[in-house]
Regions:
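A short, structured beta-strand/loop element
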Residues: 31-55
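Active-site metal-binding core of divalent-cation-utilizing nuclease and nuclease-like domains
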Residues: 26-28
Length: 86
């Protein structure tokens, strides 16, 4: 199940959300070649970031999917924690 499916399933009960995924490559200094994988959960009504999870590492194409999957699980957990605390 993808993060979009989770947001679609629970969005009506916990508010509308947008999900953004970004990969940033550091091309300077001692961390040249390091990528930061980031997923942000946005509140669609207020246009504010609710939660962010990220992972920084030297990554090969074979492991990229595993990292994004782990980040999606992390943001799903944070999404439910955020609304459970309200």
């Amino acid at each position: 199940m993808t993060l979009e499916h989770i947001v679609d399933m629970y969005g009506s009960s916990i508010g509308k959300h947008l999900v953004s995924r970004r990969v940033e490559m550091n091309n300077e200094g001692p961390f040249k070649g390091v990528k930061t994988y980031r997923i942000e959960l946005w509140d669609a009504d207020s246009h504010e970031i609710i939660e962010t999870v990220e992972r920084t590492a030297h990554i090969t194409l074979e492991t990229k999917g595993c990292i994004m999957e782990a980040l999606e699980l992390g943001i799903i957990r944070k999404m439910f924690e955020h609304y459970a605390s309200k």
